Amino acid sequence: MPKIGMEPLRRRELIDAAIRTIGQRGSLDVTVAQIAHEAGVSPALAHHYFGGKDKLILATMRHLLRELGRDLNVAIKQANTPHERIAAIIAVNFSATQFAQETIAAWLTFYVHAQQSDDIKRLLRIYARRLHSNLVFALEQLTSRARANRIAEGAGAMIDGLYIRHALGADAPDAASAIALVEDYIAIQLSGQPSAEN
């Protein structure tokens, strides 16, 4: 029987191990036993906490999205202007917890697996909608709503594209360059627009 009070710790260890295992293999073709071994626990304990691989994978993805949402809420609360809000959204998407080699590989694997999994597809759609709405909220204070939607769509595509590009590269992810590229894109798109920020 698992020790009382150990469940949250063990669940987190298994989720972290799932990110590492999926990231290392670049595939969801992993077993609960492999993830449990990476976490240093028994496969039986992993099954006890999650009930199987699919539930563990979904819990891992939800964990990454919760982390992203929590960090974003903190960053946005510190933003005082639309430009600061946009910068905060971009920076959080390329934070050290999200834009790490194994996490990037895990995200890419989730995108591929979404073609076969309605649950993963739904979670990715929630993520995309939240990113889009957060960007639009700030952008429409600087330009028209139609243009804000178009810029947000482009910025979201750039963020996803940069994750894919870094997943394919051998070098360590360069968050500063990624942030600069997305910020430059938004600045260029906004250039020549009358600013509503005063």
Curated annotation (Swiss-Prot):
Gene3D superfamilies, sorted: Tetracycline Repressor, domain 2
SUPFAM superfamilies per UniProt: Homeodomain-like, Tetracyclin repressor-like, C-terminal domain
Domain HTH tetR-type, chain residue ranges per copy: 8-68
Transmembrane segments annotated in the record for this chain: none
Gene Ontology molecular function: DNA-binding transcription factor activity; transcription cis-regulatory region binding
Residues in the signal sequence: none
GO terms of biological process kind: glycine betaine biosynthetic process from choline; negative regulation of DNA-templated transcription
Matching InterPro entries: BetI_C, DNA-bd_HTH_TetR-type_CS, Homeodomain-like_sf, HTH-type_TetR-like_transc_reg, HTH_TetR, Tet_transcr_reg_TetR-rel_C_sf, Tscrpt_rep_BetI
UniProt DNA-binding region: 31-50
Keywords, comma-separated and alphabetical: DNA-binding, Repressor, Transcription, Transcription regulation
This protein's pathway: Amine and polyamine biosynthesis; betaine biosynthesis via choline pathway [regulation]
Pfam name, any one: TetR_N
HAMAP family for the chain: HTH_type_BetI
Function: Repressor involved in the biosynthesis of the osmoprotectant glycine betaine. It represses transcription of the choline transporter BetT and the genes of BetAB involved in the synthesis of glycine betaine.
NCBIfam families associated with the record: betaine_BetI, PRK00767.1
Protein name: HTH-type transcriptional regulator BetI
Organism: Brucella abortus (strain 2308)
Gene coding for it: betI
